[in-house]
């Protein structure tokens, strides 16, 4: 008999320092009104000494505490991130060491703002195999270290944070449908972290450490391609938008959510948002949003609600999941 997987616990963690739009206006030519009207963002949390693995480890500890599990009972840890502490060891390996999950294998998954959705899909397959019983899936980012703080077109958008879930094997299906996609042909529209150095054998070099984005292209991609895939997902599951209690989307821009809701014919209230507090936290945005929705009582994790989750971003990548929570 095929095993299934369910989200049994959620948690998130934000660094303490808050940088408001007014704070940014003191550093560059911008204003709170300019940022809010174009993005819906009012502030963001920024690390001052913590690393991505520190944020992810805080989430892992919270998940263990909530579930009353010992770290030795975790079979695997997947961390979705584009801002790792180092190329190696992986951020997930650092988390494994930090919490003492001696029996868990751990690795990072890189899919930018789609990372958490891709990681959830991967983890569900691991549990469905019947080999593993439970794992931690975490999205964590310190994007403040990848931002050019003199470029207002990107500096105002991003923040730091982490969120995650405990995924456990179960008997009833809760992952109802999924569509994961990549279009590398459009990858140049959103890039970061390019660091190609000269060697004794090659004089080619290219360094572009900061996030660079073609804003209009990304907006069109999200509102056209991702929205169409969400509709396709519902059709695949033989469901309509009325069957979905909430749509949890990557928190990139309030205008994107507004246009998606209109195109799908869904009440905007079904699209919870927290970007006003945190900005765009890439792979961390969806698990942070999910955790806050559970904390507020909007979502119950009792199997009675259907949510559509969608991540989209660099790659270009996008992924959609239909979940029974």
Swiss-Prot record:
NCBIfam families: fabH, PRK09352.1. GO terms for biological process: fatty acid biosynthetic process. It holds the Pfam family ACP_syn_III_C. Belongs to the thiolase-like superfamily. FabH family. HAMAP family: FabH (MF_01815). InterPro entries: ACP_syn_III_C, ACP_syn_III_N, FabH, Thiolase-like. The active site is at residues 113, 250, 280. It is found in: Cytoplasm. Residues 251-255 are annotated as: ACP-binding. Homodimer. Transmembrane segments: none annotated. It comes from Streptococcus suis (strain 05ZYH33). PANTHER family: 3-OXOACYL-[ACYL-CARRIER-PROTEIN] SYNTHASE, BETA-KETOACYL-[ACYL-CARRIER-PROTEIN] SYNTHASE III, CHLOROPLASTIC. Disulfide bonds: none annotated. Its EC number is 2.3.1.180. Pathway: Lipid metabolism; fatty acid biosynthesis. GO terms for cellular component: cytoplasm. It comes from the Bacteria. One of its GO terms (molecular function) is beta-ketoacyl-acyl-carrier-protein synthase III activity. This is Beta-ketoacyl-[acyl-carrier-protein] synthase III. The last Arg residue of the ACP-binding site is essential for the weak association between ACP/AcpP and FabH. The gene is fabH.
């Amino acid at each position: 008999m095929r095993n299934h997987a369910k989200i049994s616990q959620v948690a998130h963690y934000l660094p303490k320092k808050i940088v408001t739009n007014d704070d940014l206006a003191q550093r560059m030519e911008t204003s709170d009104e300019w940022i809010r009207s174009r993005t819906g963002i009012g502030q963001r949390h920024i690390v001052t000494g913590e690393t991505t693995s520190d944020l992810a480890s805080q989430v892992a500890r919270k998940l263990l505490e909530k579930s009353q599990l010992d770290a030795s009972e975790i079979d695997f840890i997947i961390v979705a991130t584009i801002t790792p502490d180092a190329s190696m060891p992986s951020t997930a390996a650092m988390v494994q060491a930090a919490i003492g999950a001696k029996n868990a294998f751990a690795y990072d998954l890189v899919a930018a703002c789609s990372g958490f959705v891709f990681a959830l899909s991967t983890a569900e397959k691991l549990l469905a195999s019947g080999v593993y019983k439970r794992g931690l899936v975490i999205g964590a980012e310190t994007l403040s270290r990848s931002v050019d703080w003199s470029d207002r077109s990107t500096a105002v958008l991003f923040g730091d944070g982490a969120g995650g879930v405990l995924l456990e094997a179960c008997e009833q299906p809760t992952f109802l449908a999924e569509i994961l996609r990549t279009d590398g042909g459009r990858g140049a529209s959103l890039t970061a972290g390019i660091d190609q150095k000269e060697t004794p054998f090659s004089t080619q070099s290219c360094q572009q450490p900061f996030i660079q984005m073609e804003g209009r292209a990304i907006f069109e991609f999200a509102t056209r391609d991702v929205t169409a895939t969400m509709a396709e997902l519902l059709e695949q599951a033989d469901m309509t938008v009325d069957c979905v209690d909430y749509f949890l989307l990557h928190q990139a821009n309030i205008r994107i959510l507004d246009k998606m809701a209109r195109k799908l014919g869904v009440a905007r209230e079904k699209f919870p948002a927290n970007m006003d507090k945190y900005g765009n936290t890439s792979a961390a945005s969806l698990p942070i949003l999910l955790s806050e929705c559970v904390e507020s009582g909007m979502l119950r994790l009792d199997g009675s609600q259907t949510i559509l989750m969608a991540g989209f971003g660099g790659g270009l990548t996008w992924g959609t999941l239909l979940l029974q929570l």
